[in-house]
């Protein structure tokens, strides 16, 4: 979650609460699919996949949402964090964004088995 600071003002840096509604895979996938064209345009996303507790419909209200991403080209900090913040704002939950290149080899088979392509 990101915080916007106003110059010259002392501010409480406690982050705003994320949405406390539990997301299921259908709701999450629908929102991601509705915004897919924008994600491609803004961040040069090649593809996204949902995995983890949300994909298995086992997420709690305070769960993060796990998303596997592949970019066309390099996963620059601007692309990576821009996408992460966009998705957090869109979905109202913390996002654990994992690039395919950064995916640990021992976890790859499990994630690929449960991943749902957007």
Model region roles, listed by residue range:
Residues 1-47, 55-61, 72-118:
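Catalytic core of pol beta-like nucleotidyltransferases
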Residues 68-70:
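Short hydrophobic/aromatic beta-strand micro-patches
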């Amino acid at each position: 979650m990101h915080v916007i600071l106003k110059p010259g003002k002392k501010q409480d840096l406690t982050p705003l609460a994320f949405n406390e509604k539990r997301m299921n895979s259908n709701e999450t996938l629908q929102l991601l699919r509705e915004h897919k064209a924008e994600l491609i345009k803004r961040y040069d996303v090649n593809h996204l996949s949902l995995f983890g507790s949300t994909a298995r419909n086992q997420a709690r209200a305070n769960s993060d949402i796990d998303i596997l991403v592949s970019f066309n080209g390099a996963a620059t900090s601007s692309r990576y964090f821009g996408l992460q913040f966009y998705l957090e704002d869109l979905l109202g939950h913390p996002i654990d964004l994992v690039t395919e290149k950064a995916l640990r080899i021992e976890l790859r088979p499990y994630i690929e088995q449960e991943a749902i392509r957007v």
